[in-house]
Amino acid sequence: MSTTKVITGKVRFSYVNIFKSRAFQAGQDAKYSVCLLIPKEDKATIKKIKAAIDAAVQDGISSKWGGKKPANLKQPLRDGDAERADEAPEYEGMYFLNCNSIQKPGIVDKDLNEILDPDEVYSGCWGRASINFFPFNTNGNKGVGVGLNNIQKLKDDDRLGAARASAESDFGGDDFEDDEDF
């Protein structure tokens, strides 16, 4: 029997929202989410993901899509080289998946100790994820979604996204004196 649950190999986390749920559009339910960047050379993880997607599609055929596979089925596994590499170099050589959950995921370190500090797991660090694939049919959109179960942080790396300078570095070099012209 095929399973829709996958424990990934080592992946890079991007767009990390796992400590506080967030609604991405007005009127949507707040969810915990993360984008997983999966190295294309991790053939074992890719194989497990493709098998889980196939299992979710088979489930959808019988439970959501009226006995047949829709022609324009939305697929969760996307190619970073084809879709994002021009705007985000960290997507080069990667597949990516967007995962979310209404429930907060379990978050642990490599020794399985719970991580409570939101600064400890960030966009750019590496880890593993427990995810599940499911069919959906919402407002005419049909496809396979990805649920987020748990996160395990394994290693630090450079932060991704808009790194902000500290206030000290922004203002520390100026010799600013009180000016009565204000």
Please give the residue ranges for each predicted region.
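Acidic, gly/ser/pro-rich intrinsically disordered tails
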Residues: 1-5, 10, 157-182
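Beta-strand elements of well-folded, non-transmembrane domains
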Residues: 38-40, 133-135, 155
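A beta-strand/beta-hairpin structural motif
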Residues: 99-116
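OB-fold ssDNA-binding interfaces and closely related basic DNA-contact patches used
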Residues: 1-96
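OB-fold/S1-family single-stranded nucleic acid-binding modules
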Residues: 139-158
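Short, flexible loop/turn elements at secondary-structure junctions
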Residues: 101-103, 133-135, 150-152
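Exposed beta-sheet edge/beta-hairpin loop segments within beta-rich domains
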Residues: 111-127, 134-144
